[in-house]
């Protein structure tokens, strides 16, 4: 079996090097390379914002990013023999992270966009399997790199149906980025004005943002166009169960995959969406699963008292807001800490805080804190000393897998907080 590569010039944006990829979905986008089932392919990928959020990017840039260039994907890859009705098996052999990553809160975007309306940015240094940031002293995040956007191109008929249903959603007031030639790659007018944007996940996967899709995962994606036309990008160094703030630890990466082909399986078994499997943990068990925890829950009732029927999204949102309020009261003054960071006040400049009362469940040193549906994981040391600053870890729900060296609540023993189990309807 052969190995193929798509290399990119990382000093250039996709707009400057359009022959390496695309930022729209359309079956007429020509493939960058062709391979056989069983071949390995190495793809170098750009970050989700195509270089806009580098280390020197300001909050003004975060507040008004150019979404026309999101997401720059590497590909497509044409897999010979793949046809509609098949399943393409994509085995993730490796995801090699870059040394820089970032997390941003873009105003008007994210699960709690009305709760956190201001721009925010953290710059992460990535080394030896961990991410650290000067903006969050004492914080280390264990890595579990994966591709946030990975999938196949829809066929012509599905593209037309998808565009129609998304336009209907936009007409009802939903958040949709409709087809637009502005910033599109390729800029062929026959494609750019009709091609689908990359923001939502769809039948052939795409921007699924599933943290378990790192090394060792096997993706099973229904094929809808000849050759499957596989692409990937939007790499994440670490992420929770979702992108609560709209981003994870975003980065560039090098992806290595192996393709397999299951002829006729999608048609035979009625497979219409992405499926995936793993044979081992996506993270070491002590990071991937909690033992002792503190949880908040939510119900499908708005803060104004309006009852919604079977609204799992509202219930999850309420559970997350309840967790943030719990942390604000008993552990972290997140809002004050965010204001301090935005004003340029360093942690050592802040006044000492009184030690709060213990309100969590004590666990042995080395356990971790999990926050809301974003599943932030915080390995905790055992010093038990009271914090000396205000909210070192502001906006934790916006930070994927945030970790602290000592108990952020200042309790005598480390404690740990976790999101509730997924709501089932």
What are these regions (language model features)?
Residues 409-411, 415:
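Cysteine-centered motifs
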